[in-house]
From Swiss-Prot:
Gene coding for it: sdhE
Cellular component terms per the entry's GO annotation: cytoplasm
Subcellular location: Cytoplasm
Example GO BP: succinate metabolic process
Name recorded for this polypeptide: FAD assembly factor SdhE
Record lineage: Bacteria, Pseudomonadati, Pseudomonadota, Gammaproteobacteria, Vibrionales
Amino acid sequence: MYMLSSDERARLKWACRRGMLELDVIIMPFFEECLDDLPDQEQRDFVSLLTSDDPDLFTWMMGHGRSENPAHAAMVDKIVAHNNSKLR
């Protein structure tokens, strides 16, 4: 499993900060609690997902649409499942 350097982690944490508070609330807990446990490819998928526009991310996270990129769609599913598990 790939371990991020402290600089890489800081840059990625900054990238998790979005222009919409709703996305911060959804994405940051996943970053803080799950990222280190993801396999290398899923970590790369997460980083790639963060390059998406906020309106697209919000639509996908709310379940009102799905990314055409299968890796992004799978990562959104993981993030949403993580957040839903915290509500139980």
